[in-house]
A protein has these predicted regions:
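Walker A/P-loop
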Residues: 1-12, 41-42, 71
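Short loop/turn elements that form and flank the Walker-type P-loop nucleotide-binding site
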Residues: 3, 22, 43-48, 64, ...
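Helical "lid/switch" subdomain of P-loop NTPase nucleotide-binding domains
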Residues: 3, 32-33, 48, 54, ...
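Short glycine-rich substrate-engagement loop in P-loop NTPases that contacts/grips substrate
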Residues: 12-44
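Conserved RecA-like P-loop NTPase ATPase core
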Residues: 21, 53, 70, 97-100, ...
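AAA+/SF3 P-loop NTPase mechanochemical coupling elements
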Residues: 43-47, 51, 82-102, 147-152
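Conserved C-terminal "switch" segment of AAA+ ATPases
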Residues: 44, 103-113, 117-174
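Conserved catalytic/switch belt of AAA+ P-loop NTPases
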Residues: 51-91, 113
Length: 177
């Protein structure tokens, strides 16, 4: 939002079929474009940010189908061009690709070699409290359609304390929501 650039998330956890990313061939009933084409269409710009979450949790039960798509997407020789099975060529050369993973040993070595690793540390309790006050609580109130509902800071602080075993804020977000 701050950069005024479209931001899209692609959840990779458990994904085993590249058709989710690259679409289905037109010969199939209910064929449609893939998630990457959808992002290109929704963005209406050439430089969206695409956040691939849980890279280390891509399913390899059917081989490296999804991983191979990501390897191709990050290949400097392909220049960010992909072929959606439904729509055809898609240019993502201007996109910024961000990948998140917890366990680097579970990421395909060829793909890992193409990524610049930026290690992040978890949030402190005070940072989590600020995130809860400024973002998570207001978002939960908006979703509930209950109007303007206040929450005592001490209550949020207790929720943060109970969720302190995680470095991120995923469980905190679920608890506040």
């Amino acid at each position: 939002e701050a950069l005024d650039i479209p931001f899209h998330t692609v959840s990779l956890g458990g994904l085993s079929d590249s058709s989710h990313l690259l679409g289905f061939d037109r010969t199939y009933q209910n064929a449609r474009h893939g998630r990457l084409a959808e992002i290109a269409l929704q963005s209406q710009c050439t430089n969206p940010i695409i956040f691939f979450d849980e890279l280390d949790k891509v399913s390899t039960s059917g081989g490296n189908d999804v991983t191979n798509v990501l390897i191709h997407l990050t290949d400097p020789e392909s220049s960010g061009s992909i072929h959606d099975k439904f729509l055809g060529p898609i240019d993502l050369s201007g996109a910024t690709l961000v990948f998140a993973y917890n366990d680097a040993s579970l990421v395909h070595p060829v793909l890992m070699n193409r990524l610049r690793n930026v290690e992040t540390k978890g949030y402190s309790q005070s940072e989590k409290l600020e995130i809860a006050k400024q973002h998570l609580w207001p978002r939960a109130v908006d979703k509930s359609a209950c109007g303007d509902v206040a929450c005592d800071e001490a209550v949020l602080a207790e929720v943060v304390r109970r969720c302190d075993h995680e470095e991120g804020v995923r469980q905190l977000q679920q608890s506040v929501a």
